[in-house]
Amino acid sequence: MTQENIPVQPGTLDGERGLPTVNENGSGRTRKVLLFLFVVGFIVVLLLLLVFHMRGNAENNHHSDKTMVQTSTVPMRTFKLPPPPPPAPPEPPAPPPAPAMPIAEPAAAALSLPPLPDDTPAKDDVLDKSASALMVVTKSSGDTNAQTAGDTVVQTTNARIQALLDSQKNTKQDAGSLGTLLHGTQTDARMASLLRNRDFLLAKGSIINCALQTRLDSTVPGMAACVVTRNMYSDNGKVLLIERGSTISGEYDANVKQGMARIYVLWTRVKTPNGVVIDLDSPGADPLGGAGLPGYIDSHFWKRFGGALMLSTIETLGRYATQKVGGGGSNQINLNTGGGESTSNLASTALKDTINIPPTLYKNQGEEIGIYIARDLDFSSVYDVKPK
């Protein structure tokens, strides 16, 4: 270093005490301490790693030695195949068959004789189902016994079933009112199906409108007829099955009783203008679908009570006339005195004979009625559909 590069120091006097510098000495000492601590820590870590490594090697060596000792104690096994079996000696030739000797007839008869009673072989235990009700019994000497046994089995089975039902019923009753309410009615399931060929099907539940051709009189059974007033189409509404003007025939019975205002008519067959005929077997109804045909009811009141009323009136007038003639100037009339028992008996007899006259229903021709279709009607056997 030249003197030119030396900085100019401020002037000092000899013997003057200056300020000490502590920055350079302090920083160098701190660096030395940190370096020393780092070296010591690094050495300690290396020593720890060396110790752990040596301990792991020692454990592995110990485990391998132990495994070798255990495996060496197992003896070695050798397997040898068994020697093959010696060959079988050759079979000796079969002797020639002996000639068949004929059996004498007496010997054969002796063989076919049945065994003695004492030597009867014991029968095997076989399940006998002849007493079952499902077995077919032929007409023989044992018919009565088989039938009796079958009836006994059936009665026993029925008794067991009834006892089971009674026990279930008693169990429900013993459960109390709440237990009874918790058991609902058991119903069977039903399977759904599809209607076939709805183009030619008049479904059950349809109503045919019809006008009477004949007058109905329930005095005696009779026949009836009506004319269809409205076209009837198939279930899908595409094909005309019963044309307007078709004739329907039916029948009715004289079964009107006191208090009844309708008559039951069964319509049996329909005939279309094209000659198509089909059986209906469906009941008649009113235009709204009510069961039976309503009509005018004649209760025959005067026929039932007219004779008795006339006899009672004649008896009363006769008593009045008799009392008037023989009573003098008295103004009182007693209708309950005097004879006339024979006339009273006649009135009772007349009433007894006429009281049971049934009422009569009348329904005139031309009145509108309905027919409830009670079954599916299939016209596929007479009709067909052609594409346009």
Swiss-Prot record:
InterPro entries: T4SS_VirB10/PtlG, T4SS_VirB10/TraB/TrbI, T4SS_VirB10/TrbI. Its main location: membrane. The keyword Membrane applies. GO terms for cellular component: plasma membrane. The keyword Metal-binding does not apply. Residues 1-26, 79-102 are annotated as: Disordered. Residues 81-100 have a biased composition (Pro residues). It is found in: Cell membrane. The chain crosses the membrane at residues 33-53. Disulfide bonds: none annotated. Keywords: Cell membrane, Membrane, Transmembrane, Transmembrane helix, Virulence. Pfam families: TrbI. It is a single-pass membrane protein. Transcription is turned on at the beginning of the stationary phase of vegetative growth. Belongs to the TrbI/VirB10 family. The virB operon is essential for intracellular survival and is not involved in the invasion process. Constitutes a major determinant of virulence in mice. Virb10 seems to be per se essential for intracellular multiplication within non-professional phagocytes and is essential for pathogenesis in mice. This is Type IV secretion system protein virB10. The gene is virB10.
